[in-house]
């Protein structure tokens, strides 16, 4: 079979103008970036609001079992399903996140799908796209630079600062600067560093750190903002530091919020692209699901729902991660409601979740992972059942998509389908979209159309008025199946301070490992009788949630010993090779 990049290059494409025209988008609301991608104006949403009689489309939320390093094919299934819906005559498009350069050059690779179910051109999708990540990185670091500059000048001028500048002293506490710097790259050396070293003119010496751009609060804000006015207001609320009295200093107080918003003006517009079968795709924002809220943007979803009958969107990692955050954060803030949930499962992924196989990086895969092994698969299906029950907890019908591989036996596929239905899925279908494109997802598409007609009633895990401590406990007990939380002394103090300051109404965004339903990546299948340690709690006032770190979570990844960049190169003809 051809490589992903070879398939991408051979796929027939519409010009971006023709693709937009097919969706009924006026030419003046499209800003082309090259031949096959373009920005869509937010005026599209205003036009839709002026036509109240128009019926909005139905949203399909794609999640998965607990992911493994092998990959379950969630993006392939998301794109394949959108193509499959078009294949059976149901107009559809997809909304997905923009890839981060960190994983592209690290281990995971790109995030454009794969095979015959991918966004094309895949190299443009995976590398820079329309520059949104760079704009966001610049806006984030502008705030960091402004904060350190203000600290420097207030320190240098002392009591004369106000008289010399006409500005009120912010009295920044250098030991309590909350806003890190950011970079869209895996770079472990930037997790802890000292800045301001050198002469007095080189700034105030202090400890600093970097997070990857996808983990920035600004990325969460971009994904959750409803329009430019909302984006500006959210950025103004960002808490950058504390003063010497322990009071927050915001981006508004630093007078940098307006300039940050200016840098993000174009990044607020979703990017229109297409799949290998010319199905439209809106690509926008890119928050990770393990260290952020893990869903594409509110604006892209709303725009797509006005343009077509079915919109397929993807929530990051398993249902305990991106799906939970979709409902308890994204839905809670935006009101966007899916009609059904699709859970992606693979035979090999469920075998890996059985806990019976020894799978280690750099070691040969166990023979039973790639050959028929019904007992191991049956044990691993407990993980599938847990995710089905977890998704149904939110009040929606669940369809299981079995992403099939050539190594799967008929007996294994039959067992998986049977277990899915017994666990409460309203439908289950085998998808071969990777090999066959939309035709390979047609049965899945029919099951999804049927599920979207079923009655549903959204149920969230906790009400707004519940305390932050109670929300954390509820999330662990009901969202992960654990016994409760273990708060560090630091987390205790932080939660008490947030409650006293009136932030109890916000939802919780837990940063934890995606490789287990629990906080421990070694606990496979369906862990029970565990308590989740919460090391630290942070307020994301602009994004509108409280961020809790469950254990030693890295918000700046590092490159592994065998990074993907080793295989990426470019020929004299300008064609990129080795990108996956």
Curated annotation (Swiss-Prot):
GO terms for biological process: tetrahydrofolate interconversion. It is an enzyme of class 6 (ligase). ATP binds at residues 68-75. Its EC number is 6.3.4.3. Keywords: ATP-binding, Ligase, Nucleotide-binding, One-carbon metabolism. Pathway: One-carbon metabolism; tetrahydrofolate interconversion. PROSITE patterns: FTHFS_1 (PS00721), FTHFS_2 (PS00722). GO terms for molecular function: ATP binding; formate-tetrahydrofolate ligase activity. InterPro entries: Formate_THF_ligase (IPR000559), Formate_THF_ligase_CS (IPR020628), P-loop_NTPase (IPR027417). It catalyses: (6S)-5,6,7,8-tetrahydrofolate + formate + ATP = (6R)-10-formyltetrahydrofolate + ADP + phosphate. Belongs to the formate--tetrahydrofolate ligase family. NCBIfam families: PRK13505.1 (NF010030), PRK13506.1 (NF010031). This is Formate--tetrahydrofolate ligase. The lineage of its organism: Bacteria, Pseudomonadati, Pseudomonadota, Gammaproteobacteria, Aeromonadales.
